[in-house]
Amino acid sequence: MGACRIQYILLVFLLIASHWTLVQNIYCEVSRTLSLEDNPSGTFNWTSKAEKCNPGEFCQETVLLIKAEGTKTAILASKSCVPQGAETMTFVQYTAPPGLVAISYSNYCNDSLCNNRNNLASILQAPEPTATSNMSGARHCPTCLALEPCSSAPSMPCANGTTQCYHGKIELSGGGMDSVVHVKGCTTAIGCRLMAKMESVGPMTVKETCSYQSFLHPRMAEIGASWMPTSLWVLELLLPALSLPLIYFP
């Protein structure tokens, strides 16, 4: 009888300990960043302060990077506690070089201070500079990245392989962000597809609006055009399985 009572007490203790582990508060790094950087892979410091989260919350870190050749790189980054999610690490390239490049990284995790990435060196693998011989002298586009409309953007030559001049803006909200980036430049995307029609990046909602001038159809211009993606690949790390499936959308 005594042995059974001891086993019962141990079982209750284990259940209480397990429940406490599931609902305990964790600490997460918290920050919001909107900036334009010359060399984000080498100079951007993503170190953040820590805050205690509510019971059951996860940590997250998300960054969206947009780059135009010959300009700075726009960085929109968020670290915070989030009320729900699954432990997942995701890298997405929405638009590939040459021309405008848009990529994102997002990490959801469930350990204290697990959203502790402090730089972008392993996230932003800068494409090789396009050789002058690969530039098409007949194709030029106004090119800029700015936090406000850039009406006087300089006209720059486009690399072979680009398909149109892009002129638009990316609006992000949620995850502590409420920001707009204005984008102009040559691109390989078709239509209004710098973000490949994706509507969220981590906890942030994305809205893309644009006009564009196709090199094949110069008079084509559309706001919020709907096209199928030309290049989008997702590298997803599901923890703790540590599997790395690669998904490609032709």
Curated annotation (Swiss-Prot):
Q: Which organism is it from?
A: Rattus norvegicus (Rat)
One term under GO cellular component: cell surface
Which segment of the chain is annotated as a signal peptide?
1-25
What is the protein name given in its UniProt record? Testis-expressed protein 101
* CDD domains in alphabetical order: TFP_LU_ECD_TEX101_rpt1, TFP_LU_ECD_TEX101_rpt2
Q: Where in the cell is it found?
A: Cell membrane; Membrane raft; Cytoplasmic vesicle, Secretory vesicle, Acrosome; Secreted
Tissue pattern of expression reads: Detected in testis.
Disulfide bonds, which pairs?
A: none
The UniProt keywords, alphabetically, are:
Cell membrane, Cytoplasmic vesicle, Glycoprotein, GPI-anchor, Lipoprotein, Membrane, Secreted, Signal
KW rRNA processing (keyword) present: no
Q: Residue positions of GPI-anchor amidated glycine lipidation?
A: G224
**Glycosylation (residues):** N45, N110, N134, N160
The record's listing under PANTHER family reads: CD177 ANTIGEN
Please list the residue ranges annotated as the UPAR/Ly6 domain: 141-215
Instruction: Give yes or no: UniProt keyword Aminoacyl-tRNA synthetase.
Output: no
Q: How does it sit in the membrane?
A: Lipid-anchor; GPI-anchor
